[in-house]
A protein has these predicted regions:
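Rossmann-like NAD(P)-binding element
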Residues: 34-38, 45, 52-110
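NAD(P)+-binding Rossmann beta1-loop-alpha1 motif at the extreme N-terminus of oxidoreductases
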Residues: 1-52
Length: 110
Protein backbone atom coordinates (compact mmCIF):
# COMPACT_ATOMS: atom_id res chain seq x y z
CA UNK A 1 0.00 0.00 0.00
CA UNK A 2 1.38 3.39 -0.97
CA UNK A 3 0.60 6.32 1.30
CA UNK A 4 0.75 9.75 -0.31
CA UNK A 5 -0.64 11.68 2.70
CA UNK A 6 -1.24 10.75 6.33
CA UNK A 7 -3.00 12.24 9.33
CA UNK A 8 -2.60 12.00 13.08
CA UNK A 9 -5.64 12.67 15.26
CA UNK A 10 -4.36 13.90 18.62
CA UNK A 11 -1.71 16.55 19.02
CA UNK A 12 -0.08 15.47 22.24
CA UNK A 13 3.51 14.33 22.64
CA UNK A 14 2.81 11.02 20.97
CA UNK A 15 0.96 12.68 18.09
CA UNK A 16 3.83 15.06 17.45
CA UNK A 17 6.39 12.27 17.43
CA UNK A 18 4.25 10.12 15.13
CA UNK A 19 3.84 13.06 12.75
CA UNK A 20 7.61 13.59 12.78
CA UNK A 21 8.30 9.97 11.89
CA UNK A 22 5.86 10.14 8.99
CA UNK A 23 7.29 13.42 7.69
CA UNK A 24 10.85 12.08 8.05
CA UNK A 25 9.77 9.33 5.63
CA UNK A 26 8.92 12.13 3.15
CA UNK A 27 5.15 11.71 3.50
CA UNK A 28 3.01 14.82 4.05
CA UNK A 29 1.14 14.63 7.36
CA UNK A 30 -1.59 16.68 8.97
CA UNK A 31 -1.99 16.77 12.75
CA UNK A 32 -5.52 17.37 14.05
CA UNK A 33 -6.60 18.32 17.55
CA UNK A 34 -9.58 20.16 19.03
CA UNK A 35 -7.48 23.07 20.28
CA UNK A 36 -4.91 25.05 18.30
CA UNK A 37 -2.51 25.08 21.26
CA UNK A 38 -2.29 21.27 21.05
CA UNK A 39 -1.79 21.41 17.29
CA UNK A 40 1.01 23.94 17.77
CA UNK A 41 2.58 21.79 20.50
CA UNK A 42 2.55 18.74 18.22
CA UNK A 43 4.20 20.63 15.38
CA UNK A 44 6.81 22.00 17.80
CA UNK A 45 7.44 18.47 19.13
CA UNK A 46 7.98 17.26 15.56
CA UNK A 47 10.45 20.11 15.03
CA UNK A 48 12.32 19.39 18.27
CA UNK A 49 12.65 15.68 17.48
CA UNK A 50 13.86 16.43 13.95
CA UNK A 51 16.37 19.00 15.20
CA UNK A 52 17.70 16.50 17.74
CA UNK A 53 18.10 13.77 15.14
CA UNK A 54 19.84 16.10 12.71
CA UNK A 55 22.13 17.53 15.41
CA UNK A 56 23.35 14.02 16.19
CA UNK A 57 24.10 13.44 12.51
CA UNK A 58 26.03 16.72 12.32
CA UNK A 59 27.97 15.81 15.46
CA UNK A 60 28.90 12.46 13.88
CA UNK A 61 29.89 14.38 10.72
CA UNK A 62 27.33 12.48 8.63
CA UNK A 63 25.75 15.81 7.61
CA UNK A 64 26.94 19.39 7.42
CA UNK A 65 25.05 22.11 9.27
CA UNK A 66 23.76 23.38 5.94
CA UNK A 67 22.48 19.92 4.98
CA UNK A 68 20.80 19.61 8.37
CA UNK A 69 19.11 23.00 7.95
CA UNK A 70 17.88 21.99 4.50
CA UNK A 71 16.55 18.67 5.77
CA UNK A 72 14.82 20.36 8.72
CA UNK A 73 13.02 22.67 6.31
CA UNK A 74 12.06 19.71 4.09
CA UNK A 75 10.67 17.63 6.95
CA UNK A 76 8.82 20.48 8.62
CA UNK A 77 7.41 21.55 5.27
CA UNK A 78 5.55 18.24 5.26
CA UNK A 79 3.91 18.78 8.69
CA UNK A 80 0.73 20.83 8.89
CA UNK A 81 -1.82 21.25 11.64
CA UNK A 82 -5.56 21.77 11.85
CA UNK A 83 -8.48 21.84 14.26
CA UNK A 84 -10.97 20.47 11.72
CA UNK A 85 -11.31 17.42 9.51
CA UNK A 86 -11.46 19.48 6.31
CA UNK A 87 -7.87 18.60 5.32
CA UNK A 88 -8.57 14.86 5.59
CA UNK A 89 -10.19 14.56 2.13
CA UNK A 90 -7.05 13.27 0.41
CA UNK A 91 -5.55 11.40 3.39
CA UNK A 92 -4.70 7.73 2.77
CA UNK A 93 -3.78 6.73 6.32
CA UNK A 94 -4.98 7.98 9.72
CA UNK A 95 -3.41 7.27 13.11
CA UNK A 96 -5.44 7.91 16.25
CA UNK A 97 -3.35 9.25 19.14
CA UNK A 98 -5.88 10.84 21.49
CA UNK A 99 -5.79 10.42 25.28
CA UNK A 100 -6.90 7.07 26.67
CA UNK A 101 -10.34 8.27 27.68
CA UNK A 102 -13.30 6.42 26.23
CA UNK A 103 -15.47 9.50 25.65
CA UNK A 104 -12.69 11.14 23.63
CA UNK A 105 -12.05 8.03 21.54
CA UNK A 106 -15.79 7.61 20.89
CA UNK A 107 -16.05 11.22 19.73
CA UNK A 108 -13.15 10.70 17.29
CA UNK A 109 -14.71 7.62 15.73
CA UNK A 110 -18.18 9.12 15.24
Amino acid sequence: MFVSKAAVVGGGTMGGEIAQAIAAADIPVVVKDIDQKFVDAAVEKARAVTEGQLARLVKKEKLTSEQADTRLAEVMGLVTGTTTYEEFGDVDFVIEAVPERMEIKQAVFR
